[in-house]
């Protein structure tokens, strides 16, 4: 339940005529209820999103200028509008705040970059279940185990299960069409259900044992295997008994290498450790599933130091916000760590279901956090601050991992900032804040003109922003014409930005409040490609000084590249030791990698499905039935007319047409 308050300043003022913002009329209308507030500048950009138990007290605390830190006073000075939403409880406010932070990415909030969903290990619902790596939404048709912190952790578990339980990993289309066992069967990594080498009952027993192992019931699995081995021995089935004995030995070896949670305790645990240094923070998340430590993953928030101080300056006090805010003082490392941990838990666990127990290095400072997580998960969540035994060891490992990851990031950040500065100086860009430097790079990829694809990658805030990468399928050009491909992608990319800038009143493309127009546009190519880019920019009315070509050196050797400028400046050879060239090469190589992977995927898709798609009368369902029945396009091409006609939904006439089209 929410209520958008009326606001006299609901429309962003004209920057040229804006008067100093007067918060008093807005604050006077605010209720003393839970809710979310948003500070917005004169250009309509959201500066900060916060929640409050008492909107009136929280918002008014920011405008007591004698008690604000300099950085927060700078943010308050930019406020031109305040929007608020009233909710029923502080827990609801926390949920709404999280959604808005993720959607709007405000400059002064603690932000964790959205990560793609965590991977799972899947056992399919097939009568001979397949073991597979999986990422995406889950359903009830299959069994899912995880989530795992990384793809490596999933594949490591799959290797263990292959070695111990020998479950199949092949696709169903391959499984349904095999006549001989594959290499995995020969090296004892699969029991060969595809050729009847194991009964359905025995395979189901192996699947059940694998599931029990993943759920942490190792003792139960070992006892069951021991009983099975003795049963085979009693019946003089010594070969089968030896096979089970090998399973027991392999499983025992695995268990000796892993730290396993004590029997009888909760088996699914997350361990969170925070490290803070030099205004940067790292949250290290270690996952324990089924009592087994699956690995960890480091997260680095943006704006941690500034955002923590904003929350402190706007703190409502202990009970319902009755106390006045204390004078601004620098926050200690422990307090910043608690703020960062709260932000991480909200942003992470409202997307990923939390386990029943979370071990933490610091106590989160948000009283509504546990209530919101329990509301979201539908059960209670326990926080453990001072763990004992194995959990204590896991927390110490996570703390050490957080410290090491942060030290590595700070070191990399220093060298990356130096490269950014060198590039800005080389090209002649004057920015007070080098983190704002935005570089976009384009590359064209194809194979002999087939499946031409262009890529655009983005460098911003001293790092590659893979969430902003884009691929463009190039069409209606002469195959292999890289110039036409470059013209098409640049036109498609920047024509939209020009239209957006015109809607915003013709703002300077390099201005802070404008659309995301880059400061530098890198073109992977020499004078010819740069000339095409120059023509496109002139047609669109854009500054050709933004364009820089990266021409390969003699023999295409790395370090001998030349920068080619579209505005008439002489070409520039930077030399192998140039920090600017290192950054240019990094961005250019990433554009090439992104383009070539997309091109290969597109080409593979075209080669495997396009010929069937072109046959009239063969829709998606019939195509899938054909591919499933014959194990792929090659099997369809090898099938006779009678075999094609035997597929459900394929008439004799359609079978003849398919055969004719494929031969």
Curated annotation (Swiss-Prot):
Limits of the UVR domain: 219-254
Main location: cytoplasm
Gene name linked to the record: uvrC
Superkingdom, taxonomy of origin: Bacteria
Lineage: Bacteria, Pseudomonadati, Pseudomonadota, Betaproteobacteria, Burkholderiales
Annotated GO MF terms: DNA binding; excinuclease ABC activity
Species per Swiss-Prot/TrEMBL record: Cupriavidus pinatubonensis (strain JMP 134 / LMG 1197)
Ranges where the GIY-YIG domain occurs: 32-110
Subunit and partners: Interacts with UvrB in an incision complex.
Family matches, as InterPro entries: GIY-YIG_endonuc (IPR000305), GIY-YIG_endonuc_sf (IPR035901), GIY-YIG_UvrC_Cho (IPR047296), RuvA_2-like (IPR010994), UVR_dom (IPR001943), UVR_dom_sf (IPR036876), UvrABC_protein_C (IPR050066), UvrC (IPR004791)
Gene3D superfamilies recorded: 5' to 3' exonuclease, C-terminal subdomain, GIY-YIG endonuclease, UVR domain, UvrC, RNAse H endonuclease domain
Region annotation Disordered: where it falls in the sequence: 1-24
GO cellular component terms, A-Z: cytoplasm; excinuclease repair complex
Full protein name: UvrABC system protein C
CDD domains: GIY-YIG_UvrC_Cho
